[in-house]
Design a protein with these regions (language model features):
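Catalytic and substrate-binding regions of extracellular carbohydrate-active enzymes
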Residues: 1-119
Length: 119
């Protein structure tokens, strides 16, 4: 079993507003996939994939994380808005327990995301 906790910086317009999203893999399968991965030619890319709700993370008040926020533009991050990034607070790879914790206080003005995953 493996869990990916994505906390890194927002990577411009090709990235999605999904800090602290997780994907879970087990027995050679993705059992908790990122539902926000569609090709640019697919109409779901603009209406679904580019919104925080399409990912396995948290949204506040139904809004997407910055820099998307209230914007419907797929290039919201290209306008030089607030940099969004998470910080790895804990990483432990012990024999019996593996754990990671990350926080992000730049995805929402006045909000803080905090996520811990353990195996």
């Amino acid at each position: 079993m493996a869990v990916n906790l994505a906390y890194g910086p927002y990577g411009s317009g090709h990235d999605h507003p999904d800090r602290l999203t997780i994907t879970v893999h087990a027995l050679g399968q993705v059992i908790c996939p990122d539902a926000g991965s569609w090709g640019y030619e697919n109409p779901m890319h603009l209406t679904w994939a580019n919104q925080t709700v399409a990912h396995n993370t948290v949204s506040i008040d139904g809004l997407s994380q910055e820099p998307q926020g209230r914007s419907r533009s797929i290039w919201a991050g290209e306008r030089g808005e607030q940099r969004v990034f998470g910080v790895l607070r804990l990483f432990h790879a012990g024999d019996h327990l593996k754990a990671a914790r990350a926080t992000c206080d730049t995805a929402y003005e006045g909000g803080r995301l905090d996520r811990t995953v353990c195996l």
